[in-house]
C-alpha cells in the first residue's frame, strides 16, 4: 500500500486520511531533520573540555582513599604519603620501576647521540680508539676500570702484561710489508706520551656504547684485524709489542702456513729449551700433527736429559755411551734410539730390557715399526708379532730372553751390571748372538 501521493497535499491528507495516520506521517517526515541536527551539533564531551580547565594530574594516593587533590605541590603535604596499604605500596613500586626505565632510556639516548657524533667525526672504531688514546675524547665513567692500570704502567710493563694476555707472536695476518718498512716510524710514535701504552688504547675503548664496545674490545680487535682484513693497517697492530717481536713476525702466504706457524708456536711454548729448527723438523716428520710431535719429543727427551735423570749408575753410563742406532729417520737425528721416558712405559727403570740393551730397538727400522710405541714386550704373553708393543720379541728369529729377566728385573742387579759392559753390533742377528752368550 503506497501512501506517498497522499502525503504532500496537506488539505487532502486532512480530509481523506485518518487523523492518526496524518500524525504518523508527520512524525516520519520530521525524523531526517532531527538526525541532521544531531550530526551538526558538537559532542557534549568536547564542549565540556573547552568550557572548563584542562585536566591536571591528580594524587594517586589520595584517589585510592577517595579524595581528589591536584598533584602539583602536593607530594610533601599528602596525607597518605607514608601509607603502607596494598594500593599505596603498589603505587610506590610502579614509581620506582618507571624511574629506573626513564633513567635507562636517557642513558641509552645519550650514548647513541655520542656514538653518532663520533662516527661523524672519525668514522671507524679505530679512529675512536686512536682519539681516546691521544686524549681527544675523555674516557667515560664506564671505562674507568682500565684507567689506573694503563696510566701507571710504562711501555715495558704494558708489554709484559700484553704477553700474558695475548700470544707472544701475533697473528701473521696483521703484518703487512708496509708495517715492516715502517718500524722506525712506529718506534718513534711509541715514545709519545699519548701512545706509550698500547693497553691505554685498548682500555679507554670507543665511545659507541654497548654495541660497539664489543668491536673495540682488546680481544676482539686483533682477531677482527687478523681474520677479516688481513691487509689493513691499524694503529694497534703497528705499535703493539717490542722490536724483538716485530723481527719474529713473518707474513704468511696462506692459511696452511699460518696453521703451521701456530703449531710451531705451540711447540716452542711447550718445549722452550729446544731449538726452533729441530721442532720444525719434528713437526714436518709427524705430518704437521702437534700431538704426535709432542709425543715424539717427549719420547726422545730422555736421551737429551740423561745426566739429569740419575736413577742408577746404569742410566748414567748409558747416557755417556754413543747410541748404536742404524740409519736414523730423517725427521730427527736420535729418533731411532730407545726412549727412556714414555707415556706407556712401565715403572721399572732398572729393567735390563729397558735400558741396558740399546741395540735391540734399531732392529725395528728394518721391520718398519712405529718408533713411538715401544713400551711393553709381547712375547711374554705368546704374541710374537704384536708390533705396537714389542721389543726383542718381534720375530722368533731374533731370539728370546728368559722370562725371569722381565719378571724379576728390579731384583736381579748382577745381570744389569753385566749388560752395560757389553757392546752390540748393528747387524740384524747381533742380539741373537749376544742373547745366546747371556744364557750361559
UniProtKB/Swiss-Prot annotation:
Gene3D superfamilies: DM DNA-binding domain, DNA helicase RuvA subunit, C-terminal domain
Key words, A-Z: DNA-binding, Metal-binding, Nucleus, Zinc
UniProt DNA-binding region: 59-106
Keyword flag Metal-binding: yes
SUPFAM superfamilies (UniProt xref): Cysteine-rich DNA binding domain, (DM domain) (SSF82927), UBA-like (SSF46934)
CDD domains referenced in this protein's UniProt entry, alphabetically: CUE_DMA_DMRTA2
Listed name of the protein: Doublesex- and mab-3-related transcription factor A2
PANTHER family the UniProt entry points to: DOUBLESEX AND MAB-3 RELATED TRANSCRIPTION FACTOR DMRT, DOUBLESEX- AND MAB-3-RELATED TRANSCRIPTION FACTOR A2
Any GO MF annotation of the entry: DNA-binding transcription factor activity, RNA polymerase II-specific
SMART domains: DM (SM00301)
Tissue: Restrictively expressed in brain and developing germ cells, especially in spermatogonia, spermatocytes, spermatids, and sperm cells, and in developing oocytes, including early perinucleolus stage oocyte, late yolk vesicle stage oocyte, and oil drop stage oocyte.
Cellular location(s): Nucleus
Region (Disordered): 167-261
Predominant subcellular localization, coarse grouping: nucleus
Residue ranges with Basic and acidic residues bias: 199-213
GO cellular component: nucleus
Low complexity compositional bias, start-end: 229-241
Record field: compositional bias (Polar residues): 251-261
Phylogenetic placement of the source organism: Eukaryota, Metazoa, Chordata, Craniata, Vertebrata
Family the entry assigns: Belongs to the DMRT family.
InterPro entries registered for this protein in UniProt: DM_DNA-bd, DM_DNA-bd_sf, DMA, DMRT, DMRT5_1_DMB_dom, UBA-like_sf
